[in-house]
């Protein structure tokens, strides 16, 4: 962890390669040390779809100009871009839909799905729930790490920037472990293997709503820092949060990763936090509060069995992800949905689904009260995945299902097969 922590805020109005290259060059100059050996660039490519999700991932060209700059350093022996995208979706498909493979070809840098490559099991000294991790080879062997998040609001973790980016450092095999009411601790657990040397944040266009199908908001900013905690401290303030209110950021500080006092971070550049926060102050990020959604579906959130807290990162997160995807693909689906109720966790109180169905999502879900509903159905899983729910929620509430998309379903199947072939080729089992 650097003693002198800084964050550079530069106005960048568009994804102009020349301007982005200037800012990236300035960031390396401020860092004061050159990348050496094996360099890994990790962007956010959680999900992409050419028809309805083009604002959830780091701009490929920003990653490309960063790769060009890295190659200028004589001590760099190897350079690769790596990522593990959304669970149950082949990352290679998101690479294609976002343009990352094309960018890699233009800039001559390989783009790798961590799930298709080798890994090794490592012990964690600071982990609370993850005591070991299956660490991707490219992360474990990297001599210099550059994390390149996309600044977004997050449906259950307030913000996603440098720290939350590390969920994409996990293989899908371990992605859903502790992805429940322990998610914020999980994020900090992974920081032990995914501590970057430099953070370059794409905030030219930021995202709000469901982060995997984010709605765009033009902020006109590139943010660079020599410390992931400092980067998140500033990112939190830009999005209107006090740093201590971002739970994974507070937990990271408590575990010794550095102060989250804004005064401990030197802010440089040509635009201030206050001006940027003023720009974002009017954003209402849908799906953070389910009670504010414009829909006839009623939501009842109970506590999880592990911590006695709302299970924010478990089944309700999957519900948010499923509904967010459905509504992004077919806008208005939520507003026009049939009435009913969705319950997650252990809910103390009565549930009223009216004349519609009541879905109990997850193994632990129970209602300690009365249920008024036409039908009651349990959907098993702990936590359940958003993809699984795409076969349940649309039929229950009369919404169009992504499972019947004539374009996307064959792509998922074909790229899943290719993923398995690549895993065999690289002995990634």
Predicted feature locations:
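N-terminal and secondary-structure boundary signal
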Residues: 1-429
């Amino acid at each position: 962890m650097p003693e002198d922590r800084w964050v550079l805020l530069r106005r960048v109005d568009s994804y102009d390669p020349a301007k982005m290259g200037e800012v990236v060059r300035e960031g390396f100059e401020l860092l004061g040390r050159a990348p050496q050996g094996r360099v890994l660039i990790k962007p956010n490519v959680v999900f992409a779809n050419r028809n309805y999700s083009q604002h959830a991932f780091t701009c490929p060209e920003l990653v490309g100009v960063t790769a060009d700059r890295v190659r200028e350093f004589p001590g760099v022996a190897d350079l690769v871009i790596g990522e593990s995208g959304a669970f149950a979706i082949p990352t290679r498909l998101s690479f294609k839909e976002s343009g990352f493979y094309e960018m890699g070809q233009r800039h001559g840098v390989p783009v790798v799905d961590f799930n298709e490559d080798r890994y090794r099991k490592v012990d964690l000294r600071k982990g609370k729930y993850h005591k070991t991790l299956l660490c991707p080879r490219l992360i474990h062997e990297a001599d210099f790490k550059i994390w390149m998040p996309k600044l977004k609001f997050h449906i259950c973790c307030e913000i996603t920037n440098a720290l939350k980016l590390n969920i994409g450092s996990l293989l899908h095999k371990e992605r859903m472990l502790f992805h429940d009411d322990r998610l914020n601790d999980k994020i900090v657990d992974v920081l032990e293997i995914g501590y970057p040397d430099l953070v370059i944040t794409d905030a030219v266009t930021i995202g709000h709503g469901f982060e995997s199908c984010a709605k765009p908001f033009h902020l006109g900013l590139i943010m660079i820092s020599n410390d992931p905690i400092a980067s998140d401290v500033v990112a939190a303030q830009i999005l209107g949060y006090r740093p201590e209110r971002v739970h994974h950021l507070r937990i990271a500080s408590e575990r010794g990763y550095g102060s989250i006092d804004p005064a401990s971070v030197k802010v440089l550049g040509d635009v201030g936090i206050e001006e940027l926060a003023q720009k974002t102050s009017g954003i209402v990020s849908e799906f953070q509060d389910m009670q504010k959604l414009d829909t006839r579906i009623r939501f009842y959130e109970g506590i999880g069995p592990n911590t006695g807290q709302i299970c924010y990162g478990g089944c309700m997160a999957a519900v948010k992800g499923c509904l967010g995807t459905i509504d992004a693909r077919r806008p208005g689906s939520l507003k026009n949905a049939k009435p009913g109720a969705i319950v997650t966790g252990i809910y103390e109180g009565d549930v009223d689904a009216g004349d519609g169905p009541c879905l109990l999502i997850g193994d632990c879900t129970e209602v300690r009260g009365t249920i008024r509903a036409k039908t009651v159905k349990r959907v098993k899983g702990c936590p359940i995945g958003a993809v699984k729910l795409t076969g349940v929620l649309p039929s229950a509430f009369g919404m169009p299902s992504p499972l019947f998309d004539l374009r996307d379903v064959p792509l998922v199947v074909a790229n899943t097969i290719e993923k398995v072939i690549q895993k065999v080729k690289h002995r990634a089992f």
